């Protein structure tokens, strides 16, 4: 159910602030967004997977916390990330 290494590497490369950046909020939010989008397809097929849904809600909460942090620290980076990922806020 996880993303493979090639997909993760491309997401990190697209959202990194510098060459070796893997832990910035932008990269973390992009990885969580990809994982959340991947799991949404799973839950269309397996609606009664409540244990997995709990993990999904945890990821959504973590993404929300990271976005709130980024908005508090740097509004321009926050707005650019939201536009790039196509999130609603």
Swiss-Prot record:
**Stored PROSITE patterns:** RIBOSOMAL_S15
- Domain of life, per lineage: Bacteria
Supply the InterPro entries for this chain. Ribosomal_uS15 (IPR000589), Ribosomal_uS15_bac-type (IPR005290), uS15_NS1_RNA-bd_sf (IPR009068)
Please give the Pfam families that the UniProt record associates with this protein. Answer: Ribosomal_S15 (PF00312)
Task: Show the GO cellular component annotation of the record.
Answer: cytosolic small ribosomal subunit
Task: Please name the GO terms that the record assigns under molecular function.
Answer: rRNA binding; structural constituent of ribosome
Q: Which SMART domains match?
A: Ribosomal_S15 (SM01387)
Q: Please provide the record's keywords in A-Z order.
A: Ribonucleoprotein, Ribosomal protein, RNA-binding, rRNA-binding
Name the GO terms of the biological process aspect.
translation
Q: State the family it belongs to.
A: Belongs to the universal ribosomal protein uS15 family.
Q: Say what the protein does.
A: One of the primary rRNA binding proteins, it binds directly to 16S rRNA where it helps nucleate assembly of the platform of the 30S subunit by binding and bridging several RNA helices of the 16S rRNA. Forms an intersubunit bridge (bridge B4) with the 23S rRNA of the 50S subunit in the ribosome.
Q: Tell me, how does this one assemble?
A: Part of the 30S ribosomal subunit. Forms a bridge to the 50S subunit in the 70S ribosome, contacting the 23S rRNA.
User: What NCBIfam families does this protein's entry cite?
Assistant: S15_bact
**Annotated HAMAP family:** Ribosomal_uS15_B
Per its record, how is this protein called by name? Small ribosomal subunit protein uS15
């Amino acid at each position: 159910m996880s993303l493979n290494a090639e997909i993760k590497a491309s997401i990190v490369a697209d959202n990194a602030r510098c060459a070796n950046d893997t832990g910035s909020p932008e990269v973390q939010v992009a990885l969580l967004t990809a994982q959340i989008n991947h799991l949404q397809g799973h839950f269309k097929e397996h609606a009664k997977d409540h244990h997995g849904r709990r993990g999904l809600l945890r990821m959504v909460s973590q993404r929300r916390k990271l976005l709130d942090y980024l908005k508090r620290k740097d509004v321009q980076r926050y707005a650019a990330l939201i536009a790039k990922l196509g999130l609603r806020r």
